[in-house]
UniProtKB/Swiss-Prot annotation:
Annotated source species: Neisseria gonorrhoeae
InterPro entries: FeS_repair_DnrN, Hemerythrin-like, RIC_family
Cellular component, GO, one term: cytoplasm
Record PANTHER family: IRON-SULFUR CLUSTER REPAIR PROTEIN YTFE
Protein name, entry field: Iron-sulfur cluster repair protein DnrN
Amino acid sequence: MTDFSVWEAAPFGATVDHILQRYHNVHRAQFEELVPLAQKVAQVHADTFPAEIAGLLADMRDELLMHMMKEERMLFPMINQGVGRGAAMPISVMMHEHEEHDRAIARLKELTGNFHAPEGACGSWTRLYALAKEMADDLNDHIHLENDILFARVLDS
């Protein structure tokens, strides 16, 4: 896991900016590649590829894009304005959605055998699982930074 100690005392605005650049922008790029790649692998290897993966990744993308938009348009501006505990309700909603993201990651791990492509898998299949693991690791770090550091600090302010 990433070292987040720098964010434990950083100004809220700096933490929000980091989340936007390091996670929101990165997730958008990850899913731009992941979803079409999963659809390609599902089509080419329909007889052996777990059919649910492509749909799950598309659903994860759609849910995460909506989630990030809510943070960017509502929650993060509130945090940057210093509303403190006034952000408790939107933070609660975001944390609930984070639990849904955690469940989706768990299902993806299950479907992919913890991101291990089968022996002899083609390059696209292998790349898909490597990218999916990277996205899941990033999303876990992203959720930790928000829930356990940023949101906790905002609610304590």
